[in-house]
């Protein structure tokens, strides 16, 4: 907490995947940890705004595991204790810990089954949170197996869970839009050109990839391959994004008012590297304070959307920066201070209304 205060901040997002992992730690330790954090944060005037867990994102299928017992364990022994910790600290419970197995992506019927499983899991999470006075915030991702990865998915999930169970919100990450542009539905012309040039092209499910390779090897004609691929892909809408799904600013306009946490990272929209906002990284990146604030404001100006929960009256802009294990502590703190300094140019004090922040952009 001393480092956070030295950076000029008094709001913290705790990572549950370092000091208080729910599967590696017993309940006694978790209670001791949360009690000590609550005590020290109160003494120092620090607000624990959110608790976040994403440790399982790339190591387990988690909430949508193919095994029912594994799914239940992830829910009841990972997420529920995580929510309990957040409740003790009066914090938002942020999370992402699931993925669809490739077999589900390759079978539309199986995909629908696992999507239902996910919605049921999310519903149980939403209810558990509501009973404990905790706001849940699911992080949006950027590939077909990581639902929700498209704007339409996020809206469908928020509406479906909020209507049937209890309010559900999402976390928008400013670097989680680069992947969608790699999963666009190919046109006939793109297929023909790629076959002719012997190049690479994302064509959707595995059966289409095999057809594409057969065409490149000359086993079938390019026209036949294009016909078959386009026909098959009609049954696999879950494997394709719209180009606008890679637009960070559209995500913020469409869904920012339902995102209690916005994870900030600098990016060139070619990777989710979680860079900071130093002058060097800003020179290579596309994320700016002005774009973030204007996009959020434009979203609040839109009419309320039927089926969505009430727009939020508070959003935490949260630096989520990653560093190499060989980066020194001093260099990390230096980069953190530079990043905080950059964002303080746009948000000089916490709690300033969004419309005032946007108005101030014109006089900077």
Give the ranges of each region predicted by the language model.
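N-terminal pre-domain/capping segments
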Residues: 1-88, 123, 130, 217, ...
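Histidine-acidic metal/acid-base catalytic patches
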Residues: 2-8, 148-364
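Conserved beta-strand positions in the central sheet of alpha/beta enzyme cores
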Residues: 11-13, 50, 94-95, 137, ...
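Active-site acidic/histidine proton-transfer and metal-coordination neighborhood
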Residues: 43, 59-172, 179, 335
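Charged helix-capping and loop-helix junction motifs
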Residues: 28-34, 111-115, 119, 151-155, ...
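Active-site-proximal loop/turn and secondary-structure-junction residues that shape catalytic pockets
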Residues: 16-20, 54-57, 99-101, 140-144, ...
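Catalytic-core regions built around general acid/base machinery
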Residues: 31-44, 118-129, 157, 250-254, ...
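A short helix->loop->beta-strand "cap" motif at the edges of active sites that frequently abuts
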Residues: 44-46, 91, 134, 301-303, ...
């Amino acid at each position: 907490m001393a480092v956070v205060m030295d950076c000029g901040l008094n709001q913290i997002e705790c990572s549950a995947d370092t000091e208080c992992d729910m599967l590696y730690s017993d309940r006694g330790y978790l209670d001791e940890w949360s009690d000590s954090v609550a005590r020290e944060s109160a003494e120092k005037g620090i607000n624990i705004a959110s608790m976040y867990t994403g440790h399982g994102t790339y190591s387990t299928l988690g909430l949508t595991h193919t095994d029912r017992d594994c799914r239940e364990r992830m829910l009841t022994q990972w997420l529920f204790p995580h929510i309990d910790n957040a409740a003790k600290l009066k914090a938002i419970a942020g999370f992402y810990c699931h993925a669809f197995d490739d077999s589900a992506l390759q079978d539309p019927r199986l995909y629908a089954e696992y999507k239902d499983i996910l919605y049921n899991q999310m519903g149980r999470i939403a209810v558990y949170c509501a009973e404990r006075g905790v706001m849940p915030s699911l992080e949006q991702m950027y590939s077909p197996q990581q639902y929700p990865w498209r704007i339409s998915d996020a809206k469908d999930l928020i509406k479906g869970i909020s209507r049937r169970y209890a309010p559900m919100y999402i976390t928008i990450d400013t670097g989680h839009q680069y992947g969608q542009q790699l999963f666009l539905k190919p046109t006939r012309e793109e297929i023909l050109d790629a076959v002719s040039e012997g190049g690479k092209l994302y064509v959707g499910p595995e059966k289409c990839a095999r057809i594409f390779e057969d065409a490149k090897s000359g086993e079938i004609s390019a026209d036949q391959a294009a016909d078959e691929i386009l026909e098959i892909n009609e049954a696999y809408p879950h494997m394709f994004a719209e180009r606008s799904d890679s637009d960070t600013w559209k995500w913020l306009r469409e869904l920012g008012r339902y995102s209690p946490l916005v994870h900030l990272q600098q990016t060139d929209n070619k990777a989710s590297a979680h860079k900071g906002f130093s002058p060097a990284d800003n020179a290579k990146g596309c994320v700016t304070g002005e774009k973030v604030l204007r996009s959020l404001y434009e979203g609040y100006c839109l009419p309320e959307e039927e089926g969505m929960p009430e727009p939020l009256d508070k959003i935490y802009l949260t630096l989520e920066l990653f560093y190499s294990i060989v980066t020194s502590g001093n260099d990390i703190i230096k980069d953190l201070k530079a990043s905080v300094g950059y964002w303080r140019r746009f948000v000089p004090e916490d709690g300033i209304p969004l419309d005032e922040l946007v108005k101030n952009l014109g006089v900077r």
